[in-house]
Amino acid sequence: MITIEQVLEVLKKDHNFRDIINQEHYHYSWTGVTFDHLSYDSRDITPSTLFFAKGAGFKLEFLESAVQAGLGFYVAEKDYQVGIPAILVSDIKQAMSLVAQAFYQHPQDKLKLLAFTGTKGKTTASYFAFNILKQSHKPAMLSTMNTTLDGKTFFKSNLTTPESLDLFRMMAEAVSNGMTHLIMEVSSQAYLTKRVYGLTFDVGVFLNISPDHIGPIEHPTFEDYFYHKRLLLKNSQAVIVNSGMNHFDFVAEEVADKDHDFYGKDSENTVKHSSGFSFKAKGKLAGDYDIQLIGDFNQDNAMAAGLACLRLGASLEDIKKGIAQTSVPGRMEILTQANGAKVFVDYAHNGDSLDKLLQVVTDHQKGKISLILGAPGNKGESRRQDFGHVLNTYPEINVILSTDDPNKEDPLTICQEIASHINRKVRIIIDREEAIKTAMSETTGSSDALVIAGKGADAFQIVNGKRTDYAGDIEVAKKYL
């Protein structure tokens, strides 16, 4: 619960309060109202709800339907003149975050908070951290793929970083479940849209950076993307940074006055020797480690998670056990066909992660290698050219372009755009299951491999803004083993 006096105090302290308008009368204060529910969904309303009118696509009819359902107060950046008092603010997203924190009694102060950002690897690193911390603590986790608020039951996530009203509600639930730590993925969009406004993390980890999420509805430029990624570092008590990342010198200078650890090449904390399923680390994590996820980049993610968890109370023994136990749905999942050929299913969905994935596969498989790939519609349009550039460095790979969350675009047009950046002939099979079936029928022996990239564990296709039925890459591949 929260009183209107408390709401106004929060907004005024943040210099975000403008005024309350009611029937053309202006008010600086208001008393005698208590809210027991916060919402930004006009279909989720009670008379004691405080409603937030947010988003570029917000429509007057949404608010009108909420008023009909009994709504008595709303927060907005303008007066919609619907006959009830409006609390006007300069920034609705900032207001949502701070009011939610107060409403849920600041649950972030009752948890140790660990956040990962980066173009790729956030989910894998989060899973490493979850498995490390659960050895001796009680972690909750919010990841792109799955969320757990009790450390035991998992449910599918809708956003990499939830909207602030949902985020602090979930934090409060984690606290009530007795959780001690919370692991989060924090996207650049989370800072762009202020979902984590006012939140300070105990440890923030910057895994890597490469051009992605640049387009009309995301970041206008790489500089904007990079800046919003770095906001995690500004809002963390201690930071962990990959010394092998692009623009590391800049980031290292930026965090020089913070409590920090660097990991990766040319740093104290690095992998000294690695093989497929084990590695030896030096530095703060010195020792021998077993790992289920092959690839140097996964070992780097494990190092990042280990260093972060070391700061949050994990022992070296916890770190070793947690890394050894970690597997991630849709990340480097490997199936073996009857003829011995390997099928790799991975979420790699941008140029950099695709390149890393293909490096691992080509290191291990020396026969014919095929790749099934697509690109999502209406977002991350720069990926299509990036995919082409990467695939031009692997001329021996047989490429089949297919559907991957086309949304409101034509999947054929998306595939043709990717193909236009590839300097050899490729096939287009729009039906993703048919593409997988075809590619698996073309393998001949144990040295061959099929890589199915982009969707990972997603058991849906996004078409015209809605999730449509799709069994998922791993399940489809299992059908044709």
UniProtKB/Swiss-Prot annotation:
Gene Ontology BP annotations: cell division; cell wall organization; peptidoglycan biosynthetic process; regulation of cell shape
Binding site for UDP-N-acetyl-alpha-D-muramoyl-L-alanyl-D-glutamate: 42, 158, 160-161, 187, 195
MF term (GO), any: magnesium ion binding
Reactions listed under catalytic activity: UDP-N-acetyl-alpha-D-muramoyl-L-alanyl-D-glutamate + L-lysine + ATP = UDP-N-acetyl-alpha-D-muramoyl-L-alanyl-gamma-D-glutamyl-L-lysine + ADP + phosphate + H(+)
Its EC number(s): 6.3.2.7
Pathway involvement of the protein, from the record: Cell wall biogenesis; peptidoglycan biosynthesis
Keywords: ATP-binding, Cell cycle, Cell division, Cell shape, Cell wall biogenesis/degradation, Cytoplasm, Ligase, Nucleotide-binding, Peptidoglycan synthesis
Motif (L-lysine recognition motif): 404-407
Binding site for ATP: 118-124
Record has Cell division as a keyword: yes
Primary site of residence: cytoplasm
A GO CC annotation given for this chain: cytoplasm
Residue list for modification N6-carboxylysine: 229
Entry's localization field: Cytoplasm
Family in the record: Belongs to the MurCDEF family. MurE subfamily.
NCBIfam families found in the cross-reference section: murE, PRK14022.1
Protein name: UDP-N-acetylmuramoyl-L-alanyl-D-glutamate--L-lysine ligase
